[in-house]
Every structure is written in structure tokens, then in C-alpha cells.
């Protein structure tokens, strides 16, 4: 029997988002063994169950109220939303927040030896894709007629196999396209992972747990995007040093023993510190510059 007091979260069992989702939950302090083949895993320290399923099943599980939360790519979520609307349904859910992983783009690609004069080049062509609804929406907005060839995998081989004239598929680096004699010609949708919640009334204990989880996720993402910086800086150049390091708050300034001309400065910077920035700091007279990763952060 299902325990309705436990928060149920759906995540991808294996694939592009699985490892990042697992790491996110671990850094949020959820102790759970996700290295087995079990489809349902129970957290040891929180009333949370993790359902490990195919990524294209996750939006439906959330929209149908089977699970409370889902970690899913926006491309898969939007495709399912358009699919259900096309069938006359009114799917409901909440996007709690965008996450900082799973970035990709859904793009049109054509054979490298074919001319490209914009989307109109696809008028009357056959296009292979795993995302027919996203493709249709985009080309309908352009007023382009086309034929869709639905494939659930190996979309990039369709032109070479004579199944289609072009493709619409996810692209990360473009290496797979190049290996199959294709080139990316148009981005139609940009996606990242997101956390979604089912519609409807939520038990107070579950909502409190969701709020706690969101706070921790925010802290994890902020920590990833921030660095803890320590240095010695000349007192007369402090304003210039601080201007180079956008931070969440003002830095902590500490006196240096036996040195009236310099201070120790500690701060959290919200911007990645590149070598060029460190060289500029050194040129301003800063020394002993340390840049450290942050494991957890809460403002």
C-alpha cells in the first residue's frame, strides 16, 4: 500500500539527467541509495521516495498526480504539454524552479552539401524528429508546410538512410551531427532541467518538506555559482579590488598584524574568477590570492 505521507519524486532512471539529479539530491542532504536497479528508492533521513523512470514518463506522472515532484528537461516537459493539449486535455502542474544542469538545444539540421536559406528551405520537406509537437509549433509559426517522420532514437541517421530530408534533434556539441554528414542550421528550443510539482492540494507536511528542499536546492546552486575568495590587499586600493569581484554581500576586512598598509579581505563572489581577474587583482597590489569552492551556502 502506498504511504501518502511520503513525498514522491520522479527522476530519470538512466541517461542525460540521471547523474546530475542524483548529485543534486545528495548535495541537498538526502541520503538514498540510487546505485541499485530498484525502481523505487526510499530516503534514509527524510520521508521521501524516489521513482526512477523513463524521462518521457515524468511529465505525465506529475500531471496525473501520481508523484508530487519531478526533475525533467524542459524539452520533454514542453513536448508532453503540447501533446496533451493536442488531444484536448488541460494538463496542470507548477514549475518550481529551473535547475543549473541538463542544458541542451533542439535544433534543425540538414546535410552539409545542401544549401540553407533559412526555414523556408524546409517547405514541403520530410523532417525526422523525436519532438513532433515542438517542431510543428515552430514551423507553423513560420508558415512552413512539412512532413514529419517520428523516430524515437538514432534520428541523425535518417537523411543518410533516405528516411528524411532533414532532422530536428537535441544538440550538445554537434559532434554526432558532423559524424553523420549534417550541420546545425537553426535552434528552435533551448532547454535546461527543471523541478515541477503536481497541481492540487498538498498535505501541509509535504509542502513544508518541499519548501525545505527548495531552500537547499537554492543553496546548492548558489554554491556552484560562487567562490570564496581570500587575499591581502593594499588599503588604498580596496575600492578598485572590490569592484573587480561582484559579490553577494560586502567583503569582510581584517587587519594584518604588523602591517598598516594592507588588510586581509574575505568575500563570496557570485562571478567565476578567471585568470585575467586574478592578474588584475595582482596588478592592483593584491597578494596571497586564494579562490576556494563552496560546498553549501544559505543567505
Curated annotation (Swiss-Prot):
Keywords assigned by UniProt, alphabetized: Amino-acid biosynthesis, ATP-binding, Cytoplasm, Glycosyltransferase, Histidine biosynthesis, Magnesium, Metal-binding, Nucleotide-binding, Transferase
Gene Ontology BP terms: L-histidine biosynthetic process
CC annotations in GO: cytoplasm
A single GO molecular function term of this UniProt record: ATP binding
Cofactor(s) the protein needs: Mg(2+)
Activity regulation, short description: Feedback inhibited by histidine.
Top-level EC class: transferase
CDD domains registered for this protein in UniProt: PBP2_HisGL2 (cd13592)
Pathway assigned in UniProt: Amino-acid biosynthesis; L-histidine biosynthesis; L-histidine from 5-phospho-alpha-D-ribose 1-diphosphate: step 1/9
InterPro entries in the record: ATP-PRT_HisG_long, ATP_PRibTrfase_cat, ATP_PRibTrfase_CS, ATP_PRibTrfase_HisG, HisG_C, N-reg_PII-like_a/b, N-reg_PII/ATP_PRibTrfase_C
Keyword ATP-binding: yes
Primary location group: cytoplasm
Record's catalysed reaction(s): 1-(5-phospho-beta-D-ribosyl)-ATP + diphosphate = 5-phospho-alpha-D-ribose 1-diphosphate + ATP
UniProt keyword Glycosyltransferase, yes or no: yes
Pfam families: HisG, HisG_C
Domain of life where this protein originates: Bacteria
PROSITE patterns per UniProt: ATP_P_PHORIBOSYLTR
Catalytic activity, EC: 2.4.2.17
Family membership: Belongs to the ATP phosphoribosyltransferase family. Long subfamily.
Quaternary context: Equilibrium between an active dimeric form, an inactive hexameric form and higher aggregates. Interconversion between the various forms is largely reversible and is influenced by the natural substrates and inhibitors of the enzyme.
Function, in words: Catalyzes the condensation of ATP and 5-phosphoribose 1-diphosphate to form N'-(5'-phosphoribosyl)-ATP (PR-ATP). Has a crucial role in the pathway because the rate of histidine biosynthesis seems to be controlled primarily by regulation of HisG enzymatic activity.
Name of this protein: ATP phosphoribosyltransferase
